UniProtKB/Swiss-Prot annotation:
GO cellular component terms given for this protein: DNA-directed RNA polymerase complex
HAMAP family linked: RNApol_bact_RpoB (MF_01321)
Family to which the UniProt record says this protein belongs: Belongs to the RNA polymerase beta chain family.
The protein's role, per its UniProt record: DNA-dependent RNA polymerase catalyzes the transcription of DNA into RNA using the four ribonucleoside triphosphates as substrates.
Highest classification ranks of the organism: Bacteria, Pseudomonadati, Spirochaetota, Spirochaetia, Spirochaetales
PANTHER family named in the record: DNA-DIRECTED RNA POLYMERASE I SUBUNIT 2
GO terms assigned for molecular function: DNA binding; DNA-directed RNA polymerase activity; ribonucleoside binding
Protein name (Swiss-Prot/TrEMBL): DNA-directed RNA polymerase subunit beta
The gene coding this protein: rpoB
Length: 1155
């Protein structure tokens, strides 16, 4: 390990170590599969896969005679067909068999038949948090989506409340503020008046509805109150006699008051619009929205005054008709259907999260019910009305209390739920069979729905992604990514600005910096460094507890809901050894407001300044001196850095480098403390101290030169020697882009910030030849080429070195089996695997039959279908894999064998390669200059790199200058530094180090021109900067073509490197050539070089023969136009100057010649 000097304003020690950075993946999958509990034979918790089986079983037959009951499941871990390494090599999936013990119970006879039923295979997660599917490593990205529960919001003039379940129908309430009516919508169907909906749910009288929402007051009816009563609403109906009935909810008139007095009504109950009851402490509704709805009912059903209540039939007809238009209605069925929509566990599930959110909102303690209750509906309506009246506030839908994370375990649980419901349906159908008593448990279960659902999820789901494996940081970030897209999430086109924006609840939970730059900005984000996901799926971040103004070492994880209204101090707030704050006023934040307060008011304190950003951003030194846009680019570009042959860790680091290397899974860590007894390039053996058994050894296999998903090189190198003692958890072998157990994505270069003859104009980069000669930025890239050997209708294809019409020179590189030899250097067009396919014989002529009879089988025709090296690729063959049916057991239908050839290429730094620093300072290498021509320092040291000073001011990424200054001091003092983010070294500290190293405190030095030896006019800033080579290499982008494939209809060359296409000559290029008057060049470009088919052939003949040429035919695009016009019914013919018809096609030519 490298000894680093802590240089910054904060404390070197942290109160809380960083968690395992991929625990979000590992913990979620362990919760789903509970492998540890299965191994140790412990009882399983009712979550993940276990909860799916418990919810589906028992499955009972229609008549209740037969029941299929679930006992337990187990994973056949010992019966794994292939190891992880073999799966990658053979293109297989790393998975285990899932078996479920089922009991088929015959309730009439009491007989029980038990069987362990095969339930398909289930992919297993590797220690690195990835899955291996069809030989490729994949990551299931966590999805951030809208949390189930209740949410209150406003759109235009509509105040709305929405109850979102985990599974089931959405229930929406909305108040039309213009008309003062409250409606309900189920699954966004036609809206229903709220009072009708309540009546359908059992609030069948006006009195019940009023007493549910309003406070009620009793008033004596006497002469003194006579004037106050008109205009008020009755809360209870009054029945004086048959023709004198006063309904609850009706407005009292003066005449009504007179009737009360005359008929001896002494006391009446009225609606009290004062929304607070002082005795019970309850809040009630204070607007007349519900009363308006009762009034609207009368108009809706055209009720005459004096009618007592709405008939139940009318209510059910109205509600059911809105929900299921056009369906026949029976009242009992309608009532049952309505109840099952919300109150049946099979149709509706709020989920643990939904129930938790509703309970938090309405102060309801029972967390056991997962269906909706009347209490929930009434509370939602009351709360919405109170918001409408201005007594409560709306919810913020972008608050992290309203968004939650679905990790891999939960996503898979949902997949299994859907598949098992189909299995249940099939089992019930099979149970209805008359022969049910002869059945066995396995005959009732159909595995197909499960197998296809799991396969589809891992292979095609938007959330199961091909792992970004360019370097260890890219891997780690991919596993910590949060995606708002995908099934049940947002879509790119409909996501607005608000949902993409940074929110104050993201602090310590989601990184405000790291996100893509394109259309996915803000929709794909990263977890913050200390963040974790709690049991409900909400993101939590740790804080230190502050008690009576004193900081304690007690830690507490808070979700965004818990953190609301809490007073939180920053991590760098100064306090003494007893935890007392040194300042009388401390900077704090309270729900997104930043202010200062007395230490006594503080509840919590941040654990670390890097708490709010992601791992990638925390690797950028002096981050706080950079503009946010450039920090975003810096975070993203570190993930694109290619692993180099000889990388070095940065002189100026942040302290995160070793953590990233350790948790990324690319390095080898010692499992137990012990002594190294064997260390070779491919294997390390450690004898543990704790074990007495001489055979109990820890073996570690070292990966050498393997291809990653992105064609970069995965290579591990041993760090220990035989006889060395190692501690548990110590890094004993480096991986790609790591050095001495630290992340090392690039190299430290001596920098001069100076323009040089225009070669670093517009972000271009000038590089010294020394960098290329010393292989500082040389990387290895490995490409895989594969070919299938198939069984065809005409016979099997053959892998052979006996290929027709191929020169001996090319065949010399193949071995006796027709496969390229390992170690051969191959170029475009070389054969990697010789393969011949039988040709169809067609109609054999007598002459050919004679030849066959003379020469035997040899004359039988075969087609050359060999695997060749594509254009633009060359390199050394490092491995050949042959995968047969015997190896794998299940190749695709018709495939006999698969051959894979791996070609490695060493790529040095070239002009056109993209390079970048860690601060978003990117550019393309414009010139590689000989060392002697580079500007040099007074002691003769030539610079490694020259960057343009104009790249700094407008980009506002000053961090690169500070890094360069400190890097310069570090290089000459032989020190490496830890400069944590938001606690960086000050200018004074940097200047002190520069002085100590013997440099000017400004780090400006006199530079000398390498051409003339003369000093430059002004002093130039010199430093040491950490630069990366990015995965945008000129070799992959450079492309040229002579002849190649043409489009079928237009006969013009295809476009793009992948299609081996040509360059497009557009109309603007035509104008340019017209302006020059280059008529012949233009004609050639538009005809023979494009789509003049006959002209192409003739000009090729002429070039081969060496004859001067001036061919011009008719371009195919003209023929296409002609055919289009003929399609419109216009018969067009073309004639030359002599009146002779010009043929456009071969057929026309024949017709003209005949005519």
């Amino acid at each position: 390990m490298i000894k680093r000097v802590h240089l910054g304003q904060g404390r070197a020690d942290e109160i809380l170590d960083l968690p395992n950075l991929i625990e979000i993946q590992l913990n979620s999958y362990e919760k789903f599969l509970q492998l540890d509990k299965l191994k140790n034979k412990k009882p399983l918790l009712n979550e993940g896969l276990e909860s799916v089986f418990r919810n589906i079983f028992p499955i009972k037959s229609g008549n209740g005679d037969v029941a299929l009951e679930y006992e337990r499941y187990y994973i056949e871990n010992d019966a794994l067909n292939f190891t992880e390494k073999e799966c990658k090599r053979k293109g297989q999936s790393y998975e285990a068999v899932l078996k479920v013990r089922l009991n088929l119970q015959f309730l009439t006879t009491g007989e029980i038949r038990q069987k362990d039923v095969y339930m398909g295979t289930i992919p297993l997660m590797t220690e690195r948090g990835t899955f291996i599917i069809n030989g490729a490593e994949r990551v299931v990205v966590s999805q951030i989506h809208r949390s189930p529960g209740v949410v209150f919001y406003k759109e235009k003039d509509l105040y709305s409340a929405r109850i979102i379940p985990y599974r089931g129908s959405w229930l929406e309430f909305e108040i039309d503020s213009k008309k003062d009516y409250l409606y309900v919508k189920i699954d966004r169907k036609k809206r229903i008046l709220i009072t009708l909906f309540l009546r359908a749910l059992g609030f069948d009288t006006r009195e019940k509805i009023i007493e549910t929402f309003y406070n009620i007051k009793k008033i004596k009816v006497e002469d003194s109150t006579k004037r106050d009563l008109p205009g008020q609403y009755l809360a209870k109906s009054i029945n004086i006699r048959e023709n004198m009935y006063y309904r609850a909810g009706d407005k009292i008139t003066l005449q009504d008051v007179e009737d009360f007095l005359q008929n001896g009504v002494n006391e009446i109950e009225l609606v009290d619009f004062d929304g607070y009851d002082a005795i019970s402490g309850k809040c009630f509704v204070s607007s007349n929205v519900i009363l308006n709805c009762l009034e609207k009912e009368d108009a809706f059903f055209a009720l005459k005054d004096g009618s007592k209540e709405l008939p139940k039939e009318s209510v059910m007809l109205a509600v059911y008709g809105a929900l299921f238009p056009g369906e026949p209605i029976s009242i009992d069925n309608a009532e049952n259907d309505l109840k099952t929509i919300f109150f049946s566990e099979r149709r509706y599930d709020l989920g643990r999260v939904g129930r938790y959110k509703l309970s938090k909102k309405f102060g309801f303690d029972d967390l056991s019910t997962s269906v909706l209750t009347m209490y929930d509906i009434v509370n939602t309506i009351s709360h919405l009305l109170r918001i409408y009246e201005g007594h409560d506030i709306l919810d913020d839908i972008d608050h992290l209390g309203n968004r939650r994370v679905r990790s891999v375990g939960e996503l898979l649980t949902n997949i299994y739920k859907g598949a098992m419901s189909r299995v249940e349906k099939i089992a019930k159908d099979r149970m209805s069979n008359k022969e049910v008593f002869n059945l066995k448990p396995q005959e009732l279960i159909s595995v197909k729905p499960i197998v296809s659902a799991v396969k589809e999820f891992f292979a095609t789901s938007q959330l199961s992604q091909f792992m970004d494996q360019v370097n260890p940081l890219a891997e780690l970030t991919h596993k910590r990514r949060l995606n708002a897209l995908g099934p049940g999430g947002l879509s790119r086109d409909r996501a607005g600005f608000e949902v993409r924006d940074v929110h104050y609840t993201h602090y310590g939970r989601m990184c405000p910096i790291e996100t893509p730059e394109g259309p996915n900005i803000g929709l794909i984000v990263s977890l913050a460094t200390y963040s974790r996901v709690n049991d409900y799926g909400f993101l939590e971040t740790p804080y230190r507890k502050v008690v009576n103004g004193e900081v304690t070492d007690e830690l507490e994880y808070l979700s965004a809901i818990d953190e609301e209204k809490k007073c939180i101090a920053q991590a760098n707030a100064a306090f003494n050894s007893n935890g007392k704050y040194l300042e009388d006023l401390v900077s704090v934040r309270i729900s997104g407001d930043y202010t200062t307060t007395n230490p006594k008011n503080i509840d919590y304190m941040d654990v670390s300044p890097r708490q709010l950003i992601s791992v990638s951003s925390a690797l950028i030194p002096f981050l706080e001196h950079n503009d946010a846009n450039r920090a975003l680019m810096g975070s993203n570009m570190q993930r694109q850095a290619v692993p180099l042959l000889f990388p070095k860790p940065p002189i100026v680091g942040t302290g995160m480098e070793s953590v990233v290397a350790k948790d990324s899974g690319v390095v080898v860590k010692a499992k137990r403390s012990g002594e190294v007894i064997l260390a070779t390039s491919s294997k390390i053996v450690v004898k543990p101290f704790e074990s007495e058994n001489a055979k109990d050894l820890d073996e570690y296999h070292i990966v050498k030169y393997e291809r990653t998903n992105q064609d970069t090189c995965f290579n591990q190198s041993v760090l220990v020697k035989e006889g060395q003692k190692v501690e548990s958890g110590e890094i004993i072998a480096d991986g790609p882009a790591t050095r001495y157990g630290e992340l090392a994505l690039g190299n430290n270069l001596l920098l001069g910030v100076i323009p040089w003859n225009g070669f670093n104009y517009e972000d271009a980069i000038l590089i010294s030849d020394r960098i290329v000669k010393e292989d500082l930025y040389t990387s290895i890239h490995i490409k895989e080429f594969s070919i299938e050997v198939r069984e065809t209708k005409l016979g099997p294809e053959k892998v052979t070195g006996d290929i027709p019409n191929v020169s001996e020179k090319i065949l010399n590189k193949l071995d006796e089996n027709g496969i390229i030899r390992i170690g051969t250097y191959v170029k475009p067009g070389d054969i990697l695997v010789g393969k011949v396919t039988p040709k169809s014989e067609g109609d054999i002529t007598p002459e050919f039959r004679l030849l066959t009879s003379i020469f035997g089988e040899k004359a039988k025709d075969v087609k050359n279908n060999s695997l060749k090296v594509p254009h633009g690729t060359e390199g050394t063959v490092i491995d050949v894999q042959r995968i047969t049916k015997e190896d794998v057991g299940n190749l695709s239908p018709g495939v006999e064998e698969i051959l894979k050839v791996y070609v490695a290429k060493k790529r040095k730094l070239k002009e056109g390669d993209k390079m970048a620093g860690r601060h978003g300072n990117k550019g393309v290498v414009a010139k590689i200059l000989p060392v002697e021509d580079m500007p040099y320092l007074a002691d003769g040291t030539p610079l490694d790199i020259c960057l343009n000073p104009l790249g700094v001011p407008s980009r506002m990424n000053i961090g690169q200058l500070m890094e360069s200054q400190l890097g310069l001091a570090g290089k000459y003092l032989g020190e490496s530094y830890n400069v944590p983010v938001f606690e960086s070294a000050t200018n004074e500290q940097i200047q002190e180090k520069l002085k100590k190293a013997g440099f000017n405190p400004t780090s400006k030095e006199i530079l000398y021109d390498g051409y003339t030896g003369e000093p430059f006019e002004n002093e130039v800033m010199v430093g040491v900067i950490y630069m990366l080579k990015l995965h945008h290499l000129v070799d992959d982008k450079m492309h040229a073509r002579s002849t190649g494939p043409y489009s079928l209809v237009s006969q013009q060359p295809l476009g793009g490197k992948a299609q081996f296409g040509g360059q497009r000559l557009g109309e603007m290029e035509v104008w340019a050539l017209e302006a020059y008057g280059a008529a012949h060049t233009l004609q050639e470009l538009l005809t023979v070089k494009s789509d003049d088919m006959s002209g192409r052939v003739k000009i090729y003949e002429n070039i081969v023969k060496g004859v001067p040429t001036n061919v011009s035919g008719i371009p195919e695009s003209f023929n296409v136009l002609m055919q289009e016009l003929r399609g419109l019914g216009l018969d067009l013919s073309i004639y030359d100057d002599n009146g002779n018809q010009v043929p456009l096609t071969e057929k026309e030519e024949e017709l003209i010649n005949k005519g």
